């Protein structure tokens, strides 16, 4: 088993080097990834140097509000709440947007804009919360939750995040809840992807860590998701100077 306590220390020192004397700006949702990232920040930075922002919308369940409250209290960090629904409504009305997926991506990009607003006024660094599972699947919004200055947990699979969450003392209600990107009502990651994270991590590790390929429908599905999301992991295409 990996030494997760040592990994927490490694991530913390990495963040200290990157953020230095600036403010860490992080979006929190009551989900496992942002909770773990906030927990690590709270161990390595003065709490007044952490700007945590909760950005609910009309589809955000009350349980997320409660979990964010308990999370902030657990780690002794104050947070701001910015309800983005009015902004979402303005975009949707202006664009006559009705596609659920497109509106979900609008929400994610609005949250990115809000975080960079706070980074702007506080001379801060936006801290991302994408994990390795999401990165390899492309399960994040380009220039949305994928838009940040540093990704401290991007090398960790979802299963690693849960182990670190327990070490940090992340509230049990957050550890037990079904992961969701919060893009529409009732959405869960595993339902949308079509398989549990435990299986996804096993397949991703087999492919990308061990170089194993199998004639298996689930392997094919994961490889297809990885291939179709390749553009998310690349810088924009450009020409080289003559």
UniProtKB/Swiss-Prot annotation:
Domain of life: Archaea
GO molecular function (one): ATP binding
Catalytic activity as recorded in UniProt: deamido-NAD(+) + NH4(+) + ATP = AMP + diphosphate + NAD(+) + H(+)
Binding site for Mg(2+): 33, 134
GO cellular component terms attached to this protein's record: cytoplasm
GO biological process: NAD biosynthetic process
Gene3D superfamilies: HUPs
Residue numbers binding ATP: 27-34, 129, 158, 180
Entry keywords, A to Z: ATP-binding, Ligase, Magnesium, Metal-binding, NAD, Nucleotide-binding
Pathway(s) it belongs to: Cofactor biosynthesis; NAD(+) biosynthesis; NAD(+) from deamido-NAD(+) (ammonia route): step 1/1
Pfam families registered for this protein in UniProt: NAD_synthase (PF02540)
Entry EC no(s): 6.3.1.5
Binding site for deamido-NAD(+): 109, 142, 149, 231-232
PANTHER family xrefs: GLUTAMINE-DEPENDENT NAD(+) SYNTHETASE, NH 3 /GLUTAMINE-DEPENDENT NAD + SYNTHETASE
Subunit structure: Homodimer.
Family of this protein: Belongs to the NAD synthetase family.
Function, in words: Catalyzes the ATP-dependent amidation of deamido-NAD to form NAD. Uses ammonia as a nitrogen source.
Name used for this protein in its record: NH(3)-dependent NAD(+) synthetase
Gene transcribed to yield this protein: nadE
């Amino acid at each position: 088993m990996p030494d997760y306590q040592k990994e927490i220390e490694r991530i913390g020192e990495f963040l200290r080097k990157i953020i230095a004397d600036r403010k860490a700006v992080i979006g929190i949702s009551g989900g496992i990834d942002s909770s773990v990232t906030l927990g690590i920040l709270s161990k390595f930075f003065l709490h007044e140097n952490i700007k945590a922002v909760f950005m609910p919308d009309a589809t955000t369940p009350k349980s997320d509000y409660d979990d964010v409250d308990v999370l902030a209290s657990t780690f002794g960090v104050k947070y701001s709440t910015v309800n983005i629904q009015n902004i979402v409504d303005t975009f949707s009305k202006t664009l006559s947007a009705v596609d659920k997926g497109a509106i979900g991506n609008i929400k994610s990009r609005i949250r990115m804009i809000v975080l960079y607003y706070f980074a702007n006024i506080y001379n801060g660094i936006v801290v991302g919360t994408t994990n390795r599972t999401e990165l390899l699947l492309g399960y994040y919004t380009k220039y949305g939750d994928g838009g940040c200055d540093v990704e401290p947990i991007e090398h960790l699979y979802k299963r690693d995040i849960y182990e670190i969450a327990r070490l940090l003392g992340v509230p049990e209600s957050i550890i037990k809840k079904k992961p969701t990107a919060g893009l529409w009502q009732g959405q869960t990651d595993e339902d949308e992807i079509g398989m549990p994270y435990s299986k996804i991590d096993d397949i991703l590790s087999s492919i990308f860590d061990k170089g194993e390929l199998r004639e298996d429908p689930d392997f094919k599905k994961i490889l297809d998701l990885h291939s179709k999301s390749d553009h998310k992991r690349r810088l924009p295409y450009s020409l080289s100077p003559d």
